Amino acid sequence: MFTGLVEEIGVVEELEQLDDAVRIAVRAPKVTEDAAPGDSIAVDGVCLTVVDNVDGSFTADVMRETLDRSRLGTYRAGSRVNLERALAAGQRMGGHIVQGHVDGVAEVVSRTPSEHWEVVRFTLPERLERYVVEKGSIAVNGTCLLYTSPSPRDRTRS
């Protein structure tokens, strides 16, 4: 489980096509400092399992279902990604509980910056609308946000 608080911005180094998956290599000195094979790291909110961790970079295998339900399939070498290590027992927990299971991709409609925050309007896939409630939380690219004023199809987030 995760908190939705981004620890580090990593950089995709390589994507390797496997028979039934894609192996992604991400440069991430902070989140890899104590990572071991089998550990979970959220990559733009998607829970991935570390396959290898060498010299500040980790690799993980991404199956077709995950590529289809997330943006991971659009990444290229040089893409920047939000990263967070899994929660540890006894650790302070800010943010919200985030599982790292991706249900779909939203489309950004507009972005309006202000002095202390930014309001982002986006549309959700219709099949997900019933799961979103006013003042509820949702993770967008691994960052946990709260709804401020949802409308039937456009969801306003800040």
Residue ranges and their predicted role:
Residues 49-53, 88-96, 146-149:
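Short, Lys/Arg- and Gly-enriched loop/turn segments at beta-strand edges
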